[in-house]
Amino acid sequence: AAPLLGDAPAGYYPCPGNRVPLKADNHAAAVARMLEQRGVHYYWSWLPAKVGYDIYDEGEAVFSRAPITAAENLLLSKTNDYSNWKTRRTLGVCAGDVWYYTVHMGWWKDEEEPFAAQWETLSQAAGAKQTVFLLGDFNSEADVRGEGYDLILRSGWQDTYRLAQQRDDGYTVVQAIDGWRDAPDAAAKKRIDQIWCSRAAAVKSSR
């Protein structure tokens, strides 16, 4: 295991309930330090969710140009075991009057940890706030009907890709990736990484 990180780079906002210390090879800390060395200041937070590939502290980070005034550690899955790869958590941060949640959701057809149950937990927690953005890997294809993407739409959230005045083809996966290799369309292009807003925000571009 990597040694613990000494002093966290400037702008770090600890997430409540995070019991896993930052290590010297933490990627979010490396990005924060690189930006700091270039004279670009960001506020940031990091939340580990589980051990990935048996060696990594796999989690989520949010970087903000505005000061972070609050952070939230939300368990989305029924599983709450740091050594179990099906454990799902989301990191929420408040910057200004807006909350941002970065996510890595389970799959729609997972019998043990289905997307729908995780979405219900996330939607209730995030929906209680005024203006919210949900961003990250939803593991739900935007082009597939009747699954996770449509559930989010029916819940009243706005897809910022659709709201954008200018946008590219939208695909965030262009080849087979872990977690999708056994799917019939494993090599097909997909838009599983998305940004949703609790209201119809003005979006200039999505790319």
Regions found by a protein language model. Give the residues of each.
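Active-site regions of metal-assisted phosphoester/phosphodiester hydrolases
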Residues: 11-14, 18-207
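Acidic helix-start/capping segments at beta-turn-to-alpha-helix junctions
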Residues: 1-6, 49-51
